[in-house]
Amino acid sequence: MSSRRSVKRSLVLDDDDDEDIFYNFKVLLPNGTSVKLTLKNPEPEISMQSFVNLVKKEYDNARKDCLLMSKRMKVDWNSGGKFHLESNGGKMKGIVRFAAFKPDLCHIIRLDDGSGIASTMYENLWDLTPDTDLLKELPENYSFETALADLIDNSLQAVWPYREGARKLISVDISGDHITVFDTGRGMDSSEGNSIDKWGKIGASLHRSQKTGAIGGNPPYLKPYFGMFGYGGPYASMFLGRCDFSFCLPILICIVLLRLTLFSVRRTLVSSKTKESKKVFTLQFKKEALIDNRSIVGKNWKTDGGMRDPSEEEMKLSPHGSFTKVEIFESEFDISKIYQLQCRLKDIYFPYIQFCLATIFLCDELSKTGRTERPVAFQVNGEDLAEIAGGEVAITNLHSKGQFFSFQIRFTLFGGKRKGTAQEANARLKFVYFPIVQGKESIEKILQSLEEEGCKVSESFQTFGRVSLRRLGRLLPEVRWDSIPFMQRGNRASTLQKSCRRVKCFVDLDAGFSPTPSKTDLASQNPFSVALRNFGSKSTEKEKDDDVNIVIHREGKSVSYAHLEEKYQEWVLEMHNTHDEEAASGLDEAVLIVGSLDKKALGILRDAVRVHKEVRRKEKTWKRGQNIKILRGAYAGIHNNNVYATIDYFLIEGFEDEAGGDTRILCRPIDRPENEGCKLSIIDGISKLEVQSSLSLPITIIDSGKCLPVDANEWNRKLDKQQEKAPSKIDLLDERDCRELKIDGELPIGNSVRAGKAPPKQIVAVVRPACFTSLTPSKKLDQKNIVKMDGEEMVMVVKLKSSDKNISSQRLFPTSRKGISGLYIFSLGSKFPNLFKKAGTYNFSFSIGNSIKCNKTVVVRPSSKAARWELDDNLESLPCNVRVGSSLPPFRIACFDKYKNKIPFTSVPSLEVELEASPGFLIKIDKLETNLINDGLILKIENMLVETDELDQIRPNYEATLEIRAMDNPFSVSVPCKVNPGPLKRVAVNNPKALENLLPDSTVEDFILELFDGYNNHVAEGTDVLIHIDGYRIEDWMGINRKVDSRGCINLSGILKVTEGYGKSVSLSVMSGNEVIFCKESQIDERQLRLVTELPDCCTAGTNLMNLIFQVTELDGSLDTSIHHDEKSGCFHTMSIESDSSSVESAIRYAFVHGSCKVSSLSLPENEGVFSCRVFHSRYPELQMSIKIQVTSAPTSEREESGYSTPHSKTTPPPESGIPSITNPWPTPCSQFGVLAIRSSSLALSSETSLMDMAQYTEDLKEKINIDEERRVELEERLKCLQAQREHAEQECSRLQASLEPLGAPFPECLSTKESMMKQIEEKHHDTAASVFCCLYRKAPPPRSLFLSQKGMFGVVALLGSVASTSLSRVLSEYLGKDTMLSLVCKSSQFGPKSDEYRKFQSEAASLGRSITNRFLVICLDATRPWRNGLVRNDPQKRLAMDNPYLPNGDPIPGFKGYAVNMIDLASEELDIQSSSGYGLRETLFYGVFRELQVYETAEHLEAALPHINGGDAVSLDGVIARENGFIYSGCCTPEVHFPITVTERQEKALVQLEITRDKKRKTEEMMTEENRSLRRLVKKLKKANEKYQNFTAMADS
């Protein structure tokens, strides 16, 4: 024994070494009771009997304290060795070994007495006494579904942590009186950490500790850690079993649990098993047991429990060996509603039952594969909830459309209950669109479907909850928020606002949000709940909340609230435009209106609408003209009272095939007249809709029942009542009423007042009702007689009847004064103190809208006292222009008072009229007529003749002042005038001898024409004067069309050049209109060409006449030394000899030197006979003479010297022979100028008998070579000079072209004037009829209009008109072609080949030395088909009224510049040309050649416009020509003949200067060509002469 004890003692530590050891047991007794046994420091082993004795002792003590235990069956404690212990499936007999139990833990063991009777339920096994603080927050408003969901929450949280592959099952079985909730979670046992009593003990659940693990993560936050308070299980079972908790607890518990007294549970049994446990532990709520606990005096709340083996069915449902089963007995449930319960449970746990990618607004984040997944298997009465098709969530899914809109919000709370820590919560908001389809709202369809399934929701479209909350994936069923502020967008009844009502928000929350104890709603006072509920309010936008911080994320990025709001609105409108389908179908044909819509007034967003008069909605037909009643609250602005109105039209947005269009009702309120209603008009096929005073209401007011039809009786009653109170007229308060209101406000209506009377400071207008008939002054200010007119604006317009402008225009809203409302107080005298100073009738117009109007007049008469005279306003613009010799225009003088009001003259006053200017200029006008008109208001003065010869005193502006004075009072009128000289009547010459003793090519010096009018005044500066000259040329750009200078003269000094020859007559005349008023004829001095050398009577054939001297003399025989050839100074005087003999060549020129010309040698012919030749001046052929001489045959002779050879077969005589030599012994003056062309043949021997010394010949040849070398150097220098002149001309051309850049930039070669183009036609098209016409036209004397009428033709097409740019000139000229451009234009069609006009034209061409060899086109205006559709009004160019082309949508065609026929500019004389029928050039000629030719900016514009050009040609400014036949001509070329360019006067001067410079350049280039040719010939000649010289030198040396 001692050894055994020592062994046993070794298990017990000394008190000094360690603490005490306690073993706690709950012993289940055979009689169904249990006792608690605690052992301190027991032996490691004790006998079974000793252990039973300890149990018996505790049992006896318990019986004494509890009467219920004393009534139980007694335990046979004397069973001896039959007792054994059973713990978790293991048995212990004989000896109890404590090593099998862990100290400090409570172990449940069952004591078996060996009788074979074993109980499975034991009294008071579990202690469920709660913490009283937890009982303060028990749930309220429980329902059957929410209570059942509380039990399922526990099951879901139990099964969720299981690994993949383990069965996750929650099975609910419900019958009429029994409910079973079974799950395959980890289960419970009797262990301290997982004891089954925690399920039933309020606040003991371990699920609450897992809450923090469900904060954060990814939406939809599927972590079912729902535990919050720890009483979901017991409280739900109490509710479902209708338990009566009227048992005894401590006083605080009793007070708190009074709300639970309605529950009366019969029995609830909880059975649970863990995977490690072999036994199933049970816990039971039973009414009898709870009542029996009252004997415990409320210290403990205990309930029965037990331990048993698992059933076969339980192990089948949970193959892995763990489960929990809650059974509620004697429950009350209507089994016929089992389907609705299944649908409800599916709604609550939808994400945990199933999810797929298609369920876009729930759990799409969890679906990685796109297929439907089943996280947990839910069964209700054996039916899988995933296979149940009903439920609000499933039905909602079916009716949503389009993409969702989502974002996440992170809420952070600093402070709160836990100071110094930050709390966090997360929410994901998904917005789904439920469109209106075929006129029915999808939300209404959802409600209808729920009603059909028996799951009716007591909501309508208006009250439908548009926010659904899930916390950790579990629906909070009582959250049926109408919306959150973020979802409320747009003005009331706007498209955006209506579309937002079709959005539902699905909110997923994490565990950071706290629910109510019943988990049916969010805790209302929680800061996160408040922040979510108010998201989108102004406080959210401005972030004024100092506690909760909000961070928004969308698509993984942080976004601002403003950006989020913008994107949300865009999404809503996109969904509306894409998916909404209004079903308000019009029963009549729609009128389509595109654009020109007041979208704000109509409440629409689109640019196109369809207007109907009749639609069908809600199985009813609604028509235009139908009377309706709109109930208050139906629409913005309809708040306080119902509105009666008449339907005008129905408006549907968009085209027929477009979705998203809203339907609206346009109706006119009953208080608005018919003419202020909506107006639909169609003008020229264009529809227009004017809203005016009608209301635009959404069609949905019919759907909501807020719009009702009104029968005739109700309408008439309302109309009568409305008309009685309706505003009827506007009235002005009189002096008495204004005085009572303390307002200076009487308007002098009906009586006339004198100008200058002060107007009242204010006037008061009121609106009287229709029932107002009292004239009693005391009642005019009664409020019942004054309509308040709240919000109605009155307009007062003050206008003087004689003026088109408003004097004053004021707009006011009504105010109140002394308790009287509806007063419109307008400021008058305080704002316009000078109002009544102008005489006339003042019209005061008062109006409210277009229905209530009032007009009052005030007559103001002018003052009776005259103050001044003034010219009447009807005069034309000043200063007044008058010519000497004519009368001034009539003057109208009015008399005015001091307020500038016109008053009548009492009589015709005596007048003094003078024209005054600078000192010394005064013209009295005595000839005039005066009379009074317009009832004496106007003094008319007329026929004032102006005559004077003193205008030169006030030139050049001719400004003067006309003074009209009254002789009997101090009134006068001054009129600025401009007295211009009369027309040209006389011409004087400053130097009459300037046109005497004229010589050819001389320039007239000191020759000035003075031009006078008929009163001997110099004519005005700038006057156009036509000078006709014959034999002269004016050498400047102005030519014969001259302008008078500032002195009244035309200076021709130095520019008038003689062009005729010696002895010819010349003339100069000045034209005034068609009259010649000055003519000066002169004769050029005569000269004679004489031969000074005496000729022999006869000469031998083949010899030379030597040293012939010719002179130019005057008639008296004196030598004219001015005839001198000087090429450098431009004086060319040479002589030519012409003969029929081939031996004399006319190409030789002989130079005159101071009047004499010497011919050193003139070869005679080889044949005998009479030799004759004509000698003449090369430039003046009238200086000529003829030479005749007899030529005889030469006798035969021998050589006088033999052995002397000559370079030729012929010899020349030696110098001493006395025979004339052909050589010139001295250099002729001609050689100095390079004019005399000495040919090589001139060195030949003139006779076979002539002999020449070889040395002399060689010397002469050398001298000739030197002369030619000098000439070559001179030619090269001259070429350099010409080159410089050409370069200067090119630079000048470039400068002038730059100044004309806008005109000639594209094609400067087309930059020309009419004169230059005429000259070009004349020169380059020599054999054409157009060239002949231009030549005749240029030579015709003025006026040329007379020439045109005589010829019966108007000109050439190319010269009739001009264009604005060179690019337009080029393309139009190329379009017409050269033949058309050179066509002659005549009036009559009689200009045929056999007509007199044609033959006359041909004869005139022959007289010019021209022949018309080419065919030419004649266009007859009378024969063309003119344009007959009218001209553009008030257009000085008389353009054709042609409609511009348009695109099919009505827009103008891009790049269109105009019609070619209208782009031709016509001069004034061309505008006067008409056919016999009165049609002008544009209507006949140009319309005939161009028709409807269209001009475009570029080829791209032309190509784009081709499909829209019907039956016509088109061109572009860059050169493309498109013909009607489909041919398109591209490329670029410059036509030979083109239209001149339209230029200003300044541009014309530059253009003329450009033409002169071009001509100089052209002449310089021609001279350079000629000089180069001469240089080449001279170089060739020098080469041959040098070769000869070398040969002769060699012969002489030999």
From Swiss-Prot:
It comes from the Eukaryota. Disruption phenotype: No visible phenotype under normal growth conditions, but mutant seedlings exhibit drastic reduction of somatic homologous recombination rate after treatment with bleocin or mitomycin C. One of its GO terms (biological process) is double-strand break repair via homologous recombination. Residues 1191-1218 are annotated as: Disordered. Transmembrane segments: none annotated. Highly expressed in closed buds and open flowers. Expressed at low levels in roots, stems, cauline leaves and siliques. Expressed in the region of the shoot and floral meristems. Residues 1258-1301, 1565-1595 form a coiled coil. The keyword Metal-binding does not apply. This is Structural maintenance of chromosomes flexible hinge domain-containing protein GMI1. It comes from Arabidopsis thaliana (Mouse-ear cress).
